[in-house]
Amino acid sequence: MNQKIKILHTIIFIFSISFPFSANAMTVEEIIKGRKAMFSENYQNAKKISILLKSKKIEEAKPLMKKISDNYKKLLDYFPENTKEGFKTEARPSIWENKDEFNALMQKASDDMIKFAKAIDTAEDLRAVQKELMWSNCTACHSRFRAPH
């Protein structure tokens, strides 16, 4: 009997980890802190990208661009209705009032990071490309969807 229970637990465990991440399984605190951590990681990586590009270390910057792109895609799942308040969120209500616009901006930011990674190989003005494909998305989102801090 104990052997059957162990097998059942193993099957349940394997089954549960084989599904993609779902914010629905997380608490409000975990979701809010998780999205804040991803945005913070994106900002830290964006600053690193600036330094790397200034030093002409283009290939070292590309994995950071991919990571930022991936985070933006993940963030689409980190704004359920029950996470509008609490845990020092800086998210404005406009996110939920204009969910399609917000999601489109997150998707655009993700797509633009991939474009950025490709464009830096041939761009003459790296700062201009960085401003257009990275920083402009940060500015657009912060001005519309993030509380002043």
Set out the residue ranges of the language-model regions.
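Bacterial N-terminal signal peptides
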Residues: 9-19
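Positively charged n-region of N-terminal signal peptides that target proteins for export
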Residues: 1-6
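Sequence context surrounding c-type heme c attachment/ligation sites in exported
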Residues: 28-149
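Sec/Tat signal peptide C-region and signal peptidase I cleavage site
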Residues: 19-27
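Sequence-pattern detector for short linear motifs
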Residues: 7-9, 38
